[in-house]
């Protein structure tokens, strides 16, 4: 039996098995994309074009964020190739797959993140527990990863302020303290421990018969599956949700 897991699948199962079931067993997705997700997707597309030395969309919030990336991140030193998909065998019958935001010329994975947190230092502290970092290091066999962190603006549009005026203020607001590039390092022992953890989790996912809910996660974050969490049945008529074309629509593999 072949099991394929992505970093998102692993993180989702650890946070809430019920959400994992809805998203990756029943393959459901919300029909509408949240504003935050839309901005994040546009920002990533802009950064991809920057790394390819191509033109990008300077409009809107995502455009101003990309301008800050281009100005404050030393991205030209990486000689990076963006959007690198992978499918790597971790153990017998278990494969990790996904997409690196970029891979440098010397094989270091690069990941771009946005955050609404007011303190980038606190966000950086959380990277010590980030599965995605370790997974990307495992698949690239690199002891180091580069994370770029873009803080979303904390300023809001004024009541009598035009969109153009607001975006101009956002451009002026961005400074090096709002945009960071962080080197994350893991020892060989830490990466081996993560590999063993993923193998164990994959076994749990294969064998589980009951995808239980984690109410602690519900209390901390808003879940896009909240409206069907308690009463979803495979034969029910879906409102606000649809079946995905495939389990990992973000990938081509």
Where does each model-flagged region fall?
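Short acidic (Asp/Glu) and glycine-rich catalytic loops that position anionic groups and cofactors
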Residues: 20-26, 113-114, 172-182
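Flexible, glycine- and charge-enriched loops at secondary-structure boundaries
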Residues: 36, 122, 126, 191
